[in-house]
């Protein structure tokens, strides 16, 4: 009972001390349980009589001390919260601890906090604009995203010129550009190590750092997609050496390099290694570049016929100003050579081709020679030079190259050559009608096959016929007028007879003139007088017309671009050619025509089968794979 009374008296005295905050932990058994080591001791509510007065007083003293300590800390934190800033996205606990240690004269346990506070105090003392700095500390940018440990350490190395300037600039950066994604530690370590070198290095680095920090930070350009670590190392290790060499040799080159550094805009997507190597090559290998320029100018001049001094000067200026690469010059030389070769091939007289030797003809027109050939230009070169798709196709077509080499008029001649090689259409002494003959590729080959004992009559509505026009008729074959001209030419039956007739019109034969003057073959004037009344050409006109052996048709209408329309028009045109063949062909004759796939060609094929003993369809090797054209060959015409 006495113990309980004593405890109650102590509690009453505590109430008079206005320490109501202390009463709660003392009176509650839970707080005592938390202060003890084991919580299992207080499973039940203990009576107050079990605690002695000494224990209660000890708890009271401890709690009082802890509360006083918390009040002191709260006072300190209140002072700091007024000046608290978002310095480095780190908590201000380290700074507060270091302030407390400094006020209480405690030894330095954390070097980072004390050094950082000293650095900031020094900066505030050195800079006259302390008010501006204090205002700026309220809006310190999120600059580095890393700790300022390296910055503070580098400040202690007595390198005040660069670092003080950089710290002030960093404090003044209100917009806080996201400049380096790498740590600032690398930047400052490299600069601090380089500052221990010679004065020449320090001059270059200070200029470069001022440019990088002063200009590029304001614009906040996307300077490097690479880390700044590589750029700074390469610049410090390689570019400084280049600039030192240039300073010793040429004073002018340093100014140009500084101007180029001011324009460091489009540096991304390339590493600094390439830039530094190019600077070395441009500065150290000037003589090599001049030699290469002279060689390139000589190569350009080799392609021109006129080698005047004005042209040389123009090319030199063109080379120095625009810096033409070697690849374009190579292409220009090749194209000029190819143009000369094409001009030479086109200038050849196409009439002076002779296939009199049968062996030579087989060497030119066999399948092996023109099946896997090359075009006039390689495909890669043609794609770089020629823009027109049709010209690209022509320049890379092997049959075009073969036609120029063998002095043929067009590549279409190889179509009839392929058909003749397989079916053997033509023989010497035949009469052939070529419908749609212009420009004369088929007619030239067929005339060589039938020889001068045969005859090829060429008909076309176009006047672009590049052969001798003695056997050419300009007109529409469906008209009776042109058909009569064709029948008149068939009276000659051979090319030799036709040439003799043309020659007689120009230079009359002396024997014929004597017969006309004497009135007869005996010279007595008692002849029948037919030669006197009739002109000279009636001698050939007395011959009767004959039917032809072969009718070929490579005609095509003007294309509209609509596949079905063009197909039906082509079938109609070849049907007219077939009706013409019915009039002119002899029994056992041959008909060759071009059609396209589209549906209507099947009916036309059946029409051929009803008039010819054998009918074949064929796609020549010279016909392009993307084309829908095919050729129908009807042999052994039945006749009426």
UniProtKB/Swiss-Prot annotation:
One of its GO terms (molecular function) is rRNA methyltransferase activity. The active site is at residue 594. Residues 242-262 have a biased composition (Low complexity). Residues 1-31 form a transit peptide. It comes from the Eukaryota. It holds the Pfam family FtsJ. Belongs to the class I-like SAM-binding methyltransferase superfamily. RNA methyltransferase RlmE family. This is rRNA methyltransferase 2, mitochondrial. The gene is fsjB.
């Amino acid at each position: 009972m006495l113990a309980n009374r004593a405890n109650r008296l102590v509690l009453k005295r505590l109430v008079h001390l206005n320490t109501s905050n202390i009463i709660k932990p003392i009176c509650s058994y839970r707080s005592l349980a938390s202060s003890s080591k084991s919580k299992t001791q207080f499973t039940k509510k203990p009576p107050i009589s079990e605690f002695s007065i000494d224990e209660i007083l000890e708890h009271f003293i401890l709690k009082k001390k802890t509360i006083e300590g918390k009040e002191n800390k709260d006072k300190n934190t209140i002072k700091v919260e007024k000046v608290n800033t978002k310095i480095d996205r780190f908590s201000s606990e380290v700074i507060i601890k270091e302030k407390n240690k400094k006020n209480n004269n405690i030894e330095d346990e954390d070097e980072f906090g004390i050094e950082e506070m000293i650095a900031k105090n020094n900066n505030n003392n050195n800079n006259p604009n302390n008010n501006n700095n204090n205002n700026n500390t309220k809006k310190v940018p999120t600059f580095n995203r890393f700790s300022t440990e390296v910055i503070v350490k580098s400040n202690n190395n007595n390198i005040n010129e660069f670092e003080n300037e950089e710290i002030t600039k960093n404090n003044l950066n209100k917009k806080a550009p996201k400049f380096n994604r790498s740590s600032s530690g690398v930047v400052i370590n490299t600069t601090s190590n380089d500052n221990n070198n010679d004065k020449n290095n320090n001059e270059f680095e200070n200029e470069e750092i001022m440019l990088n920090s002063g200009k590029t930070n304001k614009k906040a350009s996307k300077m490097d997609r690479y880390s700044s670590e590589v750029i700074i190392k390469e610049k410090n290790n390689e570019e400084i050496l280049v600039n030192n060499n240039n300073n010793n040799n040429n004073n002018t080159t340093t100014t140009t390099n500084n101007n180029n550094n001011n324009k460091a805009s489009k540096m991304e997507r390339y590493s600094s290694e390439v830039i530094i190597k190019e600077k070395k090559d441009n500065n150290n290998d000037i003589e090599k570049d001049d030699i290469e320029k002279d060689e390139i100018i000589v190569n350009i001049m080799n392609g021109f016929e006129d080698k005047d001094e004005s042209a040389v000067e123009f090319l030199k200026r063109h080379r120095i100003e625009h810096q033409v690469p070697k690849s374009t010059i190579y292409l220009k030389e090749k194209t000029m050579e190819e143009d000369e070769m094409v001009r030479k091939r086109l200038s050849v007289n196409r009439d002076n081709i002779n296939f009199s030797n049968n062996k030579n003809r087989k060497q030119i027109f066999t399948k092996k020679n023109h099946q896997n050939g090359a075009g006039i230009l390689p495909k890669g070169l043609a794609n770089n030079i020629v823009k027109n798709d049709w010209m690209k196709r022509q320049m890379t077509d092997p049959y075009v190259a073969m036609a120029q080499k063998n002095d043929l008029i067009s590549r279409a001649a190889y179509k009839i050559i392929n058909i003749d090689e397989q079916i053997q259409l033509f023989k010497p002494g035949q009469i052939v009608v070529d419908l749609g003959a212009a420009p004369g590729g088929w007619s030239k080959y067929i005339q060589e096959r039938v020889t001068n004992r045969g005859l090829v009559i060429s008909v076309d509505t176009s006047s672009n016929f590049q052969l001798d026009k003695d056997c050419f008729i300009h007109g529409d074959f469906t008209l009776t007028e042109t058909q009569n001209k064709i029948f008149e030419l068939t009276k000659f039956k051979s090319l030799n007879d036709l040439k003799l007739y043309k020659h007689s019109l120009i230079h009359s034969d002396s024997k014929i003139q004597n017969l006309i003057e004497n009135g007869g073959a005996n010279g007595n004037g008692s002849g029948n007088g037919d030669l006197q009344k009739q002109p000279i050409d009636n001698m050939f006109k007395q011959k009767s017309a004959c039917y032809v052996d072969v009718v070929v048709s490579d005609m095509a209408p003007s294309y509209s671009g609509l596949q079905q329309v063009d197909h039906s028009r082509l079938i109609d045109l070849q049907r007219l050619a077939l009706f013409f063949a019915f009039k002119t062909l002899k029994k056992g004759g041959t008909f060759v025509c071009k059609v396209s796939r589209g549906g209507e060609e099947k009916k036309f094929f059946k029409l051929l089968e009803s008039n010819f003993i054998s009918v074949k369809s064929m796609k020549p090797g010279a016909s392009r794979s993307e084309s829908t054209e095919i050729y129908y060959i009807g042999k052994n015409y039945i006749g009426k």
